[in-house]
Amino acid sequence: MNQTLLSKFGKPIERIKNAILALKSGQGVIILDDEERENEGDLVFACENMTVEQMALSIRYGSGIVCLCITESKRKQLNLPMMVKKNTSAYRTGFTVTIEASKGISTGVSAKDRLTTIKTAIADDAKPSDLNRPGHVFPLRAHKGGVLSRPGHTEAAIEIVSLAGFKPAGVICELTNKDGTMARTPEIIKFSENKKMQVLTIQDLIFYIKNINHL
C-alpha cells in the first residue's frame, strides 16, 4: 500500500479514529485492501444511518453491486442460503442468495428501494418472510474471525462500523473509474478528497485490533 499517498489521512491509528468519528457523524468511509489482494477501495457505510443519498452515491460511483455485510447469526436469522455450496471464488467471498424487501418497494432497483431492503434485513426482529429472494441487494456473510482470519472488505466493514458503535452490519460497494475500470489508490484518494471522505486500510484495522482494541 502506498503509505505516501495515505499519509495525508494520518498514521494507521489516526485513520481508524477518524473513520470511527466519520461513521458516528453519519458519513461514509473508504477502505482499501492490500495491493497484492484485490487492490480495490470500497465505499463503506453503517447500515443503521445510511441515507438514500449515500446509496445513490454508491450506485453512481461504485460498481453497482451493492453488498450488505452481515454476521453468520444474522444470516441464520434471515434463513439465507449461501449462493453456492462449494465456493471456488478467489477470495471465498461469502455471497448468500440475493434479497429484496417483501414490502415497501417497487422494482427493488432504486437507491430508495435498495436501502429499504437493507433496513428491513438488519432490523432486530427481521424474519425470513420480510425478504423476497432473489433481489437487487447482495448479502455477504463475514468470516467469524473477522479481519484477523480473513482480511477482506466484508469483515473490515463489520469491524469498523462495530467500532463506531453500530450493529455489525455494513454496506459496501467497490469504487470504479468513469471508464468502468476499477479505481486504484491514486484515483481513490482523489475521489475521497472531492467527497471529503476518510480513507483507511484493512491493514490499519488489523493493527488497531491487535494493538489497541485488545488491550
Swiss-Prot record:
Cofactor: Mg(2+); Mn(2+)
SUPFAM superfamilies, sorted: YrdC/RibB (SSF55821)
Residues binding Mg(2+) 1, per UniProt: 38
Residue(s) at site: Essential for catalytic activity: 136, 174
Co-factor remark: Binds 2 divalent metal cations per subunit. Magnesium or manganese.
One Gene Ontology term, aspect cellular component: cytosol
Entry similarity comment: Belongs to the DHBP synthase family.
Protein's recorded name: 3,4-dihydroxy-2-butanone 4-phosphate synthase
Organismal lineage: Bacteria, Pseudomonadati, Pseudomonadota, Gammaproteobacteria, Enterobacterales
